[in-house]
Structure formats: C-alpha cells, structure tokens
C-alpha cells in the first residue's frame, strides 16, 4: 500500500484552522493554547523542566515561577476551579457529534486508517464522526511540521487540526490522537497516579521531564474510574527514555500475578470505553452496530422490560449503502401518540434526524429503508406495564438510486475487505444542467488482466446499456471521471474468492466554469478541472499572485545539457521592473557555453538601466564574465566550472525586444582539445613560410626568315 506523503497542503489553502503547531506550548503530543497555560499551574512545570516548555519552534520558553506566598487571592481561587477539558462543558462535543475533514495530502490507505480509527471509537461509545458539511466547529486531519499532535477536546469557534505526522499513520496512534480530540488527557497524568506507577526521573531525557507531570484533583475529572494500566492514553514504560532499555514509568504492583503492561496502541481498553461513555452521557443500554447485518432487542426480551429505561442503537453501514430495518416482534404498552413506552426510528445519525416512525403496542411496523447509511433507534419506557418488548433485524443494501449533488460511495464494508459475492448498482443523478464528477480516494480490487472476477464498471448514463466509461480493477486509482449528462451508472461486483479493501470515491455536480462569458475570470487561459477550474498562461508568462492574471515569466534552475533562454515576453518587448535569474548546472567535468542569437536592451555605456550579467557559478559574487546591454551581440561565453548564472534586469522606463540565447554543455577535455586545436591552427598559420612567387624570365629568340 502507498503510505507516501504529498506535502502539498491542499485543504490548508482554503481552511483557516486552529493549528496545533502554533500552540503556546506542548505537553507531549498535546497542544496547549494560552487559555490552557493560564489555567494550569505553570510553576509546577518549570520546577521539573527548569524552563523547558517546548514551543512550536523547538525552542524553550522561560516562564518565571511566582514566589511562594505571593499568589493573589484571585489566583488561589482560580487554582481550585476545575480546569481539565473533560470537566469543562465547552470542551465536550455537543451530542457527541464530531464533524471531520481529511486533508488532500493523504493517500487512500491513510484515509482508510483514519476511518477505521473513527469507527473504532464509534463502535464502543456513543461518539459519532461525521464528514463535515456546513458545521462551524470540526476537525481537520492534516500533516503539520510538528508531527503527531492535537488539542484536547473541542476548541470551538471554527476548525481545529489533528496532525498525523510521518510514522504516526498507524491505527493505534490515530485512535490515541482521537482520544485527545474527544477530550482525554494522558492516563499517567491523573492526580492519583503515584499510587499506581513510579516515575524513574533519572532515566528521562533531559528537557522532557515536564511530560511526566501529574494534574491536581481540581484540574482533571477522572469520572470515578479506577487507574487504567491498559488505557490507550497511557505512556509506554520507556517513553522519553535516555535509552531504549531504560524504564521511565513502571507499575507499582502486580495484577493477577504479573506486572501489567502499559502503553498499548492496539484498541480501546474497557476503562477508555467506560470513561468516554460517562463523559458523553451515553445511554445505559444500546450500542453502535456496524456489521452488514444483525439484530437487536429491548433489554430482557422476551421476558419483559423495566420501567424508566432509555436505550439507543446506532446503525452505521458503509457510505453508499442503505439500511433495511424490520421489526420481528413488538409488545409495548399502548398509549395515545405512544406517549409512555415507544420506539423511535430516525433517518440519520442522531436524535434530530428526520423521524421515520414512533411505535408502540403490538402492531409490527412495515419495513423501513434508510435514505443514507445510518439509522437512529431510541427506546424509552415510563410505565410499569410488563410487555415482551421488541426485537428487530437489519441488513445493509448496496446500490440504489442516488439523487444528490454530492456524496460518497464506498465498496461494502470499506475500509475493511469487501464481502464475497456482492453485486451493487448505483444510479447517480445530479441537478439538471450539470455533469457528474467522480474522484477516487482509494482503490484496491482483485487484479486481473480483463477484470473478470472483481471489478468496478462505470457507464455514461442511467442504465447498463449506456456507453462504457471503463471497467476497473487492480491497485491503481482510476483517473477522474466526468459524465456527459447529469447521470452516471456504477456497478461493483465481487466473486466468491479473493477480497480486497475495495474503493472509496466522491461524486459531485460538475460544471464547466471556463464556458462562462468571463472565461472564469482568467486573463489568458482557463482550464476546467473536475470540481473546479484553474487559470493558466501562454508560454513565456506565469500566473500572478491573484492566480488569474498573467505576467511575463523568467528565470529558473536548469540541469539540461542544452537548451535556450530568453527575456520575458520574447519576442515582444520585455516588461518593466523584471529581475530574472537562470542558474544552469551541468554534470561534473562539464563546462557550459552560452551563445546569444538576438540581443537588444536599453543601451548605456555602463549598463546601468537594463542589462544581462553572466557569471561562472551560482551566486551573485561568482566570477563575472560580462555585463551586457545595448544592441551589440556578445561573444560566446564558456563557464569556468560546471555551472553558470545569468541575470536579466530591467528598470521602469524604456523596454526593448530583449534577448534570445542557446546554451550547451560539453566535457572539459573536449573543450580544452578544441581550444588547443584552435591555438595550434593559429600557430601554424603564423609560422608557415612565405610563398615566393616565381619569377618569369623572358628570353629573346632570334627568328630566321624561312628560305
């Protein structure tokens, strides 16, 4: 699988999130803002670290410690207030719903890991992760220079980042970081930790002592749970150690006859689950069901339920699937409007989703099919009437008609392996006048030369007879796809043998912005892309800072053996106030020659205004070969080494046609031989003897008259 990073921060260009890398300080992988620093007793941190609270730049920040006895009454009162995010309501996500966005700089495999980690939290708690639509507060999975870090709890007032740095894209580590997002500090910082673990300070790396601070009772709420060695939020025994075999934190006693292991990054512990359920006030009964089919029933079924019960079941299947829910048994107290005992079914992920039905009595409801991939089922009892309760079964249905302008479709059971013998057909329709655009996030389907076994088939239209766009399998993501109408037909098929991770794609309505009368606002060229567009420029020009206008381009770092360069806008007049630098680099033992074919700049005896400057080397103080201006063509220039620097400058007044030049590289020996041969030829011409023009002698012959 591809775990490489594309460091181009796609989401960051458009989202102004709360960046953990710009935090006031760090506490391990926890980002602290100014409010956190104001609320915590920083003097305790300084005692241990000797002025080493790590900032984002890696430098240390000095924080002076207040003298004992000098704290004000207000400060003493503030120290008694509860300060940890788990005890502060504003840091808890409302209704346990956490909207998220995954930045564009992650591969499909990494995105799958993030979703697996979120589903893990959902399965064991009542927390819900939801792809963000228009929510103000949400998290952004991104890759930041500070590595793996997050704020604790909801910060509010906009997006906040959770940074998943290199080597952090592992399931357990992402589950740990999401624990901070949900609202948990590290387990070993609990106030009662000294009763359970020993901190071996002499083994801690210098400057990292602050990571082993413990919080005071008024600063954290442990929610009545006992110390949890097995917590995924606990440090390992050698964390921040001077050596890999030196322990920094050790349990003080055995559990069931053995020293308990700490620092696991495999799954949530029972203690993690219990604390999260308490923090988010999860109902005492009910659960999150994520399998493709299953059943659930009221507590005690069929022997009756108790009064004053409250249970919630959250059914969640793969995006692109729907849920069919059938009640197989129903026996609740009957009342007008089902006022006392009832079951509510809502079409979505939470209690405010559209109501599909409220049921009581003994009449079994008709089948309910969800609009999307989630259902919310709530059961309440308030009477003393004893009935059997209810029982229900559900099943995930893949495919169907989808009439939305945007959304997600994934193979059944994604990001886990898809199931055998599946056949799913989706018919996508977006608004009239638009096209359907598809962009793949990940793709892994059993490989075959003709995609005969497992495959994804896409057709340009609304039926299986529409023109075929392609049949895809293997591990390479298909290119983006755009329909010719507002409809697209998608079919996924798996056989009974090999199963893979499947696919994940986004669909959306697509319009050609470049067809608008203003050319998309672009000065020269408009390039339509899937879901958007971009401006481009003609050869010799580059985009301006507004990403719409074009200006003459120039300069660059060139490693070709030969090529050409020219002034901006050539052969038109160059623009004013340009400063272009070309850096030419050839292989070692090569030399670069520059030959001007055309040359015309503003003329001046000392080349003060517009000029071309050529140097051997890459810096502005390298050996100067010449500074040229006017209309006289410079002679051929050969570099002293294997690199050359050419700089062109124009002022804000007169502009001329500029220049056009070719460069070529040859090995030093070849150039030396050529130079030597030229010198020999010149020498031979100088030393050759002068040719003597032969003299012509005239001899007079006396002619005799014939007889």
UniProtKB/Swiss-Prot annotation:
Comment on bound cofactor: Binds 1 zinc ion per subunit.
Species in which this protein is naturally found: Xenopus laevis
Main location: Golgi
Residues covered by the CUB domain: 285-397, 398-509, 554-666
Glycosylation sites: 62, 105, 295, 326, 562
Pfam family for this entry, one: CUB
Name of the top EC class for this enzyme: hydrolase
Cofactor(s) the record lists: Zn(2+)
Reported function: Metalloprotease involved in pattern formation in gastrula and later differentiation of developing organs. Able to cleave chordin (chrd), suggesting that it may act in dorsoventral patterning during early development by regulating the chordin (chrd) activity.
Binding, Zn(2+): 176, 180, 186
GO CC, alphabetical: extracellular space; Golgi apparatus
Domain of life: Eukaryota
InterPro entries cross-referenced by the UniProt entry: BMP_1/tolloid-like, CUB_dom, EGF-like_Ca-bd_dom, EGF-like_dom, EGF-type_Asp/Asn_hydroxyl_site, EGF_Ca-bd_CS, MetalloPept_cat_dom_sf, Peptidase_M12A
EC number: 3.4.24.-
One of the record's GO molecular function terms: growth factor activity
Residues of the EGF-like domain: 510-551
Record note on modification: Proteolytically activated in the trans-Golgi network by furin-like/paired basic proprotein convertases, cleavage is not required for secretion.
Chain ranges of the Peptidase M12A domain: 84-283
Region (Disordered): 57-90, 682-707
Active site: 177
Disulphide bond pairs: 126-282, 146-168, 148-149, 285-311, 338-360, 398-424, 451-473, 514-526, 522-535, 537-550, 554-580, 607-629
Protein name: Bone morphogenetic protein 1
């Amino acid at each position: 699988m591809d775990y490489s990073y594309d460091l181009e921060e796609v989401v960051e260009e458009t989202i102004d999130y709360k960046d953990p890398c710009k935090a006031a300080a760090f506490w391990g992988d926890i980002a602290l803002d100014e409010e956190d620093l104001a609320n915590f007793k920083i003097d305790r941190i300084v005692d241990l670290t000797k002025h080493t609270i790590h900032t984002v730049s890696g430098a240390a920040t000095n924080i002076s410690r207040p003298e004992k006895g000098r704290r004000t009454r207000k400060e003493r009162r503030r120290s008694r207030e509860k300060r940890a995010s788990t005890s502060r309501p504003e840091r808890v996500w409302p209704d346990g719903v956490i909207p998220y966005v995954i930045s564009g700089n992650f591969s499909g495999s990494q995105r799958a890991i993030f979703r697996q980690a979120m589903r893990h939290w959902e399965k064991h708690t009542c927390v819900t992760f939801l792809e963000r639509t228009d929510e103000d507060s949400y998290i952004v999975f991104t890759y930041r220079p500070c590595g793996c870090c997050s704020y604790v709890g909801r910060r509010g007032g906009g997006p906040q980042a959770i940074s998943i740095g290199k080597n952090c894209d592992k399931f357990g580590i992402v589950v740990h970081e999401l624990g901070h997002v949900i609202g948990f500090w590290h387990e070993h910082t609990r106030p009662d930790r000294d009763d359970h673990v020993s901190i071996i300070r002499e083994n801690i790396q210098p400057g990292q002592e602050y990571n082993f601070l413990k919080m005071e009772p008024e600063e954290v709420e442990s929610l009545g749970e006992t110390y949890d060695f097995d917590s995924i939020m606990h440090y390992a025994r050698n964390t921040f150690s001077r050596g890999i075999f030196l322990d920094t934190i050790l349990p003080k006693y055995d559990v069931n006859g053995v020293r308990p292991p700490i620092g696991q990054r495999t799954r949530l512990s029972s203690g993690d689950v219990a604390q999260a359920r308490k923090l988010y006030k999860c109902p005492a009964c009910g659960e999150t069901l994520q399998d493709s089919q299953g059943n659930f029933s009221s507590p005690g079924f069929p022997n009756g339920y108790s009064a004053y019960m409250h249970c919630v079941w959250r059914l969640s299947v793969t995006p692109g699937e729907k849920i069919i829910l059938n009640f197989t048994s129903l026996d609740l107290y009957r009342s007008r409007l089902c006022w006392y005992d009832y079951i509510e079914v809502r079409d979505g992920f939470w209690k405010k989703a559209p109501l599909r039905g409220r049921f009581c009595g003994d009449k079994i409801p008709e089948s309910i099919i969800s609009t999307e991939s989630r259902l919310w089922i709530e059961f309440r009892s308030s009477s003393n009437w004893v009935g059997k309760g209810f029982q229900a079964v559900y099943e995930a249905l893949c495919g169907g008609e989808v009439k939305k302008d945007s959304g997600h479709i994934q193979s059944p059971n994604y990001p886990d392996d898809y199931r055998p013998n599946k056949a799913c057909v989706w018919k996508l329709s977006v608004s009239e006048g638009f096209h359907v655009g598809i962009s793949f996030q990940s793709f892994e389907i059993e490989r075959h030369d003709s995609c005969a076994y497992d495959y994804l088939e896409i057709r340009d239209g609304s039926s299986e007879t529409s023109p075929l766009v392609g049949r895809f399998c293997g591990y390479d993501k298909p290119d983006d796809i755009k329909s010719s109408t507002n409809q697209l037909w998608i079919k996924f098929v798996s056989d009974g043998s090999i199963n893979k991770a499947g696919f994940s794609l986004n669909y959306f309505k697509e319009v050609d912005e470049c067809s608008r009368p203003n050319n998309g606002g672009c000065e020269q060229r408009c390039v339509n892309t899937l879901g958007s567009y971009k401006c481009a420029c003609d050869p010799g020009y580059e985009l301006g800072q507004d990403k719409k206008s074009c200006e003459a381009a120039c300069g660059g770092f060139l490693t070709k053996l030969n090529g050409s360069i020219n002034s901006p806008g050539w052969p038109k007049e160059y623009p004013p106030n340009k400063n272009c630098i070309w850096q030419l680099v050839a292989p070692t033992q090569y030399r670069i020659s520059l030959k001007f074919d055309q040359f015309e700049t503003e003329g001046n005896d000392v080349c003060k205004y517009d000029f071309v400057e050529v140097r051997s080397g890459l810096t502005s103080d390298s050996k100067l070969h010449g500074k040229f201006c006017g209309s006289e063509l410079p002679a051929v220039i050969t570099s002293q080494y294997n690199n050359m620097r050419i700089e062109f400058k124009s002022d804000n007044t007169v502009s001329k046609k500029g220049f056009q030049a070719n460069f070529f590289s040859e090995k030093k020996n070849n150039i030396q031989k050529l130079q030597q041969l030229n010198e020999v030829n010149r020498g031979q011409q100088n030393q050759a003897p002068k040719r003597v023009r032969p003299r012509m002698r005239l001899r007079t012959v006396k002619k005799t008259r014939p007889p």
